[in-house]
Amino acid sequence: MPDPRFYEDLGPVPLAELAKLGGADLPAGADGARLIRAAAVLAHAGPDTVTFLTDRKHLPGLARLEGACFVQARDASVLPDGCIPLVTRNPHGAYALAAQTLHRPRAVGSDAIAPDVVLEPGVELGAGVVLGPGVKVGRGTRIGPNAVVGAGVAIGRECDIGANVTLGFALLGDRVRILAGAVIGEPGFGATAGAQGLIDIPQLGRVIIQDGVTIGANTTIDRGAFDDTVIGENTKIDNLVQIAHNVRVGRNCVMAAHTGISGSVEIGEGAQFGGRAGVADHVTIGAGARVGAAAGVMKDIPAGETWGGMPARPIRHWLKETAWLARMANRRGPDGKGAGNDA
């Protein structure tokens, strides 16, 4: 279930209504009046949830699946008896519409400081700070001018939140430092096709920032699609870094400016990223790995290795290839001209 501190539950909704919304057919004998209370991904589905299946790599985990599941016709037979198949041409789009119907992000509200905000002793608030309903701020924390802290956010002790920072759907540990203009907890980039065009997929997760993390100015960290985006203890992130939904960053990592981490990347402890490094989605970066500046990582990097280039590869291979290309470009042909010289 989405964290109730951040999301309102709008259900329950009858199964027949969700099926109609997603353009799905109820199987014969299914109880259309059955109440569905939440949308969930497969790993978290329960008897009163609706989920979806689009990739057969998840089949081994379906044995105990319950509730209802949007599927294409070819996959309906693989669902266990305890799960109701909702057959549709677009399971992901149907799930997105169901999630929008069942859940809604909590609003900040009209009060600059909501009446139920909890501030421990020694908290300092700059001019124009907005604190939404249910916000909790730990002892000795400073929040700079015009920062906006969304509903339900918890900030630990001795934190420093810079001017114009936006925090939402987030839980912060102690001694976290966030520089001016950073945006934490906005929806991750997720869309799928629908009958009337693209549909935004609701992002129902959170951002967890552990103790001692530093986040640079104008950096953005998206909340999870359903699970959490996690920034590990004592990790240091430079300005203008983008971290997408569901990313899990280990402890003591370093990311230089303009690094971009795509969705669902796993980063081990002590990994380092040079400026403008980019990582494709669902890649694993091992503990202690190093990624060179401007590298484009398209596959897993083993622990302790250093990679560079585009596409990224072990640094020695990349340096050898770069040196070879330079030599070939400067070779003189039979006419005495350089290979790269058309003059």
Swiss-Prot record:
GO cellular component: membrane
HAMAP family membership: LpxD
Protein name per the record: UDP-3-O-acylglucosamine N-acyltransferase
Active site: 245 (proton acceptor)
Natural source organism: Phenylobacterium zucineum (strain HLK1)
Taxonomic placement: Bacteria, Pseudomonadati, Pseudomonadota, Alphaproteobacteria, Caulobacterales
Metabolic or biological pathway: Bacterial outer membrane biogenesis; LPS lipid A biosynthesis
InterPro entries from the UniProt entry: Hexapep, Hexapep_transf_CS, LpxD, Trimer_LpxA-like_sf, UDP_GlcNAc_AcTrfase_non-rep
Entry's family note: Belongs to the transferase hexapeptide repeat family. LpxD subfamily.
GO BP annotations listed: lipid A biosynthetic process
Function per UniProt: Catalyzes the N-acylation of UDP-3-O-acylglucosamine using 3-hydroxyacyl-ACP as the acyl donor. Is involved in the biosynthesis of lipid A, a phosphorylated glycolipid that anchors the lipopolysaccharide to the outer membrane of the cell.
Recorded catalytic activity of this chain's protein: a UDP-3-O-[(3R)-3-hydroxyacyl]-alpha-D-glucosamine + a (3R)-hydroxyacyl-[ACP] = a UDP-2-N,3-O-bis[(3R)-3-hydroxyacyl]-alpha-D-glucosamine + holo-[ACP] + H(+)
Complex formation: Homotrimer.
